[in-house]
From Swiss-Prot:
Chief place where the protein resides: cytoplasm
UniProt organism field: Saccharophagus degradans (strain 2-40 / ATCC 43961 / DSM 17024)
Keyword match Transferase: no
GO cellular component, one term: cytoplasm
EC number: 6.3.2.8
Source taxon at top rank: Bacteria
Record has Plastid as a keyword: no
Keywords from the named record: ATP-binding, Cell cycle, Cell division, Cell shape, Cell wall biogenesis/degradation, Cytoplasm, Ligase, Nucleotide-binding, Peptidoglycan synthesis
Localization per record: Cytoplasm
Protein name: UDP-N-acetylmuramate--L-alanine ligase
Family statement: Belongs to the MurCDEF family.
């Protein structure tokens, strides 16, 4: 049977040029790349040039730096993300010219409509889990299309157009836009209090939105959910679709056990239902949270009848995702043992705790130096005590000012205030640094032989590890 893609649907053939406002964003750039590979003319704009915009331009995307009304001239449709305000000149021009404007998730939903969609949702672990599922499907010769929120190291991209019916993508709950998706398989890794402004500060609304997302599955679809997460398990009775669970919990359908970590390497087993053989697995990523992410991928692959060898090989050969415990290497510090440099995207207290736990499990005798940049004043305010608690568990803390992500400052939710509160706990004495450019000098002054240095957060702290590596930690 011939596969139907979005470009082969007669109604879509009127669409020629698709313009993305904010094309440098992780989710936007992935969709743009897939559509480009399907034969559409793609243009896009962003406020500043980046590795992502340069890569897209090299592929043939017409990239504008800066937002201007003339950028949408000739566009058949304009795609925007929730980060773009309605007063953006390109959106205003599109409305004036009656050019259709669609949200990023709506376009992803159109891509998914004509394929066997696998959507991965959850507060934490979406990118890694989506990447692991894609890796296993590729190892099983399924050749999936994938759209993820980080750089898949094996592909050198955050998106790829496959020839099969499979499309694997992250489902974003931050603005509830994942409700535009209608996949065949939905994964929920966990549910935590984040992006609460979208849900008017009401956690019950967030939970109901996840239920609504799962009910977008057809009656023959499948929900794969984490049996270790108390909020997820609380929702299971309300899900009127087939459900399989995964986790460390004894009652999970796909149960991870016998976990052994040696540095960044994990070995573990997964017991499976219905007479399926228990799998012995290897993953070159540390942390029990990544065991859960991998077990979710095993559950999806097993339900999709992927061969056991492909599951094992897909995990064993997985090369990781950019900024997800990305190890930059070991660097000489005086005459003693080398110091290791790691970069990680986690910016929620639970994610930071998972990173710290991975270090303590894999390198129990090494000092942990964390350079942390809080992301958004609202998140810092809402989870203030959680941040104080988790950041007090490192050995040395360098605290950058909050990365605003467009928000106005909130009194008491800045990093100077956070630093003072952590200091009063008497466990860690933070070093406050205003901007990333001041960090290399601080690291040079405090680094000790054998240290593990982690640059942590979702803002421009992500540029720091590369700079520190270039300077040999100084």
């Amino acid at each position: 049977m011939t596969e139907v893609t979005i470009h082969q649907v007669p109604e879509m053939r009127r669409i020629r040029r698709i313009h993305f406002v904010g094309i440098g964003g992780a989710g936007m750039s992935g969709i743009a790349e897939v559509l480009l590979n399907q034969g559409y003319e793609i243009s896009g704009s962003d406020l500043r040039e980046s590795d992502v915009t340069r890569r897209l331009a090299g592929m043939g995307v017409h990239v504008f730096i800066g937002h201007h009304a003339t950028n949408v001239d000739g566009a058949s449709v304009v795609v925007n993300s929730s980060a773009v305000e309605s007063g953006n000149p390109e959106l205003m021009e599109a409305r004036e010219k009656r050019i259709p404007i669609v949200r990023r998730a709506e376009m992803l939903g159109e891509l998914m409509r004509y394929r066997h969609g696998i959507a991965v949702a959850g507060t934490h672990g979406k990118t890694t889990t989506t990447s692991l599922i894609s890796s296993i499907l590729a190892a099983g010769k399924k050749d999936p299309t994938f759209i993820i929120g980080g750089l898949l190291n094996s592909a050198g991209s955050n998106a790829g157009l496959g020839e099969s019916r499979y499309l694997v993508a992250e489902a974003d709950e931050s603005d509830a836009s994942f409700l535009h998706l209608q996949p065949m398989v939905s994964v929920v890794t966990n549910i935590d209090a984040d992006h609460m402004d979208t849900y008017e500060g009401d956690f019950s609304k967030l939970k109901q939105t996840f239920i609504d997302f799962l009910h977008n599955l057809p009656f023959y679809g499948l929900a794969v959910v984490c049996g270790d997460d108390p909020i997820v398990t609380e929702l299971i009775p309300a899900i009127s679709r087939s459900v399989v669970t995964y986790g460390f919990n004894e009652d999970s359908d796909y149960r991870a056990f016998d976990v052994r970590q040696d540095g960044s390497k994990l070995r573990f087993k997964v017991a499976r239902p219905e007479g399926l053989a228990t799998l012995e697995l290897f993953l070159n990523m540390p942390g029990k949270h990544n065991v859960l992410n991998a077990t979710a991928a095993v559950a999806v692959a097993s339900e999709e009848k992927v061969d056991d060898d492909a599951i094992q090989n897909g995990l064993a050969n997985f090369m990781g995702v950019g900024r997800r415990f990305e190890i930059y290497g070991e660097f000489e510090v005086g005459a003693g043992p080398t110091a290791m440099l790691v970069d990680d995207y986690g910016h929620h207290p639970r994610e930071v705790a998972a990173t710290i736990a991975a270090v303590r499990d894999g390198w129990p005798d090494r000092r942990l130096v964390m350079v942390y940049q809080p992301h958004r004043y609202s998140r810092t305010r809402d989870l203030y005590e959680d941040f104080v608690e988790v950041l007090s568990t490192v050995d040395q803390l360098v605290l950058l000012e909050v990365y605003s992500a467009g928000e106005d400052p909130i009194p008491g939710a800045d990093s100077r205030h956070l630093s003072r509160t952590i200091r009063t706990r008497g466990v860690v004495d933070p070093i406050f640094v205003e901007g990333v450019e001041g960090v290399p000098a601080v690291i040079k002054d405090i680094v000790q032989p054998g240290d593990i240095i982690i640059t942590q957060g979702a803002g421009n702290v992500g540029t720091l590890a590369k700079e520190l590596a270039k300077r040999n930690l100084g």
